[in-house]
From Swiss-Prot:
InterPro entries with a match to the protein in the record: Endothelin, Endothelin_toxin_CS, Endothln-like_toxin
Gene that encodes it: EDN1
A Gene Ontology BP annotation from the UniProt entry: regulation of vasoconstriction
Protein known as: Endothelin-1
Organism of derivation: Ovis aries
Pfam families for this protein: Endothelin
Amino acid sequence: MDYFPMIFALLFVAFQGAPEAAVLGTELSTGAESGGERPVPTTPWRPRRSKRCSCSSLMDKECVYFCHLDIIWVNTPEHVVPYGLGSPSRSKRSLKDFFPTKATVHRKRCQCASQTDKKCQNFCQAGKELKDQDSMEKAWDNRKRGKDCPKLGEKCLQQQLVVGRKTRRLETISNSIKTSFRVAKLKAQLYRDKKVIYSRAH
């Protein structure tokens, strides 16, 4: 059996399919066509993440769940975590973002991508109002506690520390419960919307 034609064909295919040769060939052909000018290199296309709004803090899980539409939420034994937040494309920031003024200290919970999206506007505004209300309640509680202390002295301060720890723990628990209820509500609403769209399609 003669293997020479098969080996020759394989070598021919290997040398013709070499990437260096192919690249060199394209460079020569484009150079000849354009008269020696180099072609402008094109940047690779990057898919943009679909965002309804951008949160002021990624620690606010409810806001992240509401705003980032393409995040897959993964259930872990401890908590629900977002998957797919890595390197979201964002516009360049101005110097105002790096040096916040007094006017921007009380900013919204999030910033909507579309100004006509009423649901988003309500969500971002409601979050800001809730935060303001919580901070006002905390300040009022602290003021009430401070009135009783001058009478009792050191014992009062120790009691305040214990009460402060307990209240912080209770606040953390209540906040996590509120967040989980809100997330469950949003998930149920999302599921209902998908069901309606699916039933209309079929």
